[in-house]
């Protein structure tokens, strides 16, 4: 798959929803519904409210995204 039309943004998890879905507040002020990518799910990386994450979104639907990375806390 080509990644030429992917939009990558950072945000903070605000709410944990059923079926591994999360509500994410992006740095630009928008809220997005996001699910976990396969690599995060396979490696059992725990994502909790308050964590900073990187999200990939498609330009066709800017209300949904995929969590690709959990940023480390300082």
Swiss-Prot record:
Family matches, as InterPro entries: NA-bd_OB-fold, RNA-binding_domain_S1_IF1, S1_domain, TIF_IF1
PROSITE patterns recorded: S1_IF1_TYPE (PS50832)
Domain of life the protein comes from: Eukaryota
Protein name, entry field: Translation initiation factor IF-1, chloroplastic
Keywords from the UniProt entry: Chloroplast, Initiation factor, Plastid, Protein biosynthesis, RNA-binding, rRNA-binding
UniProt-annotated location(s): Plastid, Chloroplast
Pfam families xref list: eIF-1a (PF01176)
Species annotation: Chlorokybus atmophyticus
Entry GO CC: chloroplast; cytosol
Family statement: Belongs to the IF-1 family.
UniProt subunit comment: Component of the 30S ribosomal translation pre-initiation complex which assembles on the 30S ribosome in the order IF-2 and IF-3, IF-1 and N-formylmethionyl-tRNA(fMet); mRNA recruitment can occur at any time during PIC assembly.
HAMAP family documented for this protein: IF_1 (MF_00075)
SUPFAM superfamilies reported for this sequence: Nucleic acid-binding proteins
Annotated function: One of the essential components for the initiation of protein synthesis. Stabilizes the binding of IF-2 and IF-3 on the 30S subunit to which N-formylmethionyl-tRNA(fMet) subsequently binds. Helps modulate mRNA selection, yielding the 30S pre-initiation complex (PIC). Upon addition of the 50S ribosomal subunit IF-1, IF-2 and IF-3 are released leaving the mature 70S translation initiation complex.
